[in-house]
């Protein structure tokens, strides 16, 4: 069997969607597993909606996920160009070939005529199909026209999908669709077929919303004299309400999850499990995915996107990283929030205590910004724990900290336990006012970690501030 040549062909009309990213991932894994070629092609024929910013977002999203391409707009290759708008002559040549061979024809019907026919079909409550008005007319390139593909009027087309199995489409549900507009721009099916033929694509893996296009495309491959590639139609990704995943379900772009502080390893891991499985294993390294991935293990039923599960996967990946690696990768998020963090022992300690408590780098910043910013007191915590009753506790702990040469765990533990014993209180009754004074809230890592991260001078300053607030 020939080595696979697969492609990811997004339209640059917005961000890289989670669904598109999974399609790219499955293609990339298949190519890498089998020593094949992963091609990136940009389908930018919608000139009004296509933007360079969207192209850049696609590039950035794929690179962040670690999905490198072997051929594409920026890296070149033997089958370019890789933007559809730069391939119009190629489409024209193939359309003219079909006309010469009687497999396509010029349609001179005006928009008004076609609109009237659609309205009549709607009034009669039937689906509009082009009636073949121009099917037998001679080709006159001087007249305004589009090119239509000639579909057989009887019979059916069957193909075996790698995910869904055999699929049959009767020709009677198809119509002589437009393949080339009057301005020379191809319609989706024809553009995709010509590109796949001329780029030697031999496996097309895409979302199953394209299943209905496949019979049409196979007819076009055959009309052009080429074997059709194999097809694998991937199950849809749904939101929690079992409708197609969209913005109303929350973030749906790859870059949004990057900005929220997800690891690319975790996003890849979660996306590949939306429709594919390998036994009961949940977490996979990149090498394991390349080794195990096979389209035969892709399920045919839609996957439900669960952001909590994705956050769990990310948390598991974060816990695999060393303190040093955590700090290095968390640093840009603290800096983006305007916090004066650096890749140093302090940040490594912050990440060490965050490891079990926060699931994303965004949560690291949200939950632990008080290590780098002035305390923002929670009003309820302030009213409950910064009172005249707790003043003696805060004063005693402050004095004890001031007397320590270093904030070592054993010394801090003795200080807090001695103070609790002296007052006949549980340890929590002593620690909680100190916690509120140092962090602004009632939930934090262990008090000894908090003190060690803040350092002696900053801890004393915050305790002094709390005492001033009490008055």
From Swiss-Prot:
Highest taxon of source: Bacteria
Cofactor stoichiometry and binding remark: Binds 1 zinc ion per subunit.
SUPFAM superfamilies on file: An anticodon-binding domain of class I aminoacyl-tRNA synthetases (SSF48163), Nucleotidylyl transferase (SSF52374)
Subcellular location: Cytoplasm
Sites where the protein binds ATP: 247
Alphabetical keyword list: Aminoacyl-tRNA synthetase, ATP-binding, Cytoplasm, Ligase, Metal-binding, Nucleotide-binding, Protein biosynthesis, Zinc
EC number: 6.1.1.17
Predominant place of localization: cytoplasm
PANTHER family reported in the protein's UniProt record: GLUTAMATE--TRNA LIGASE, GLUTAMATE--TRNA LIGASE, MITOCHONDRIAL-RELATED
Protein name per UniProt: Glutamate--tRNA ligase
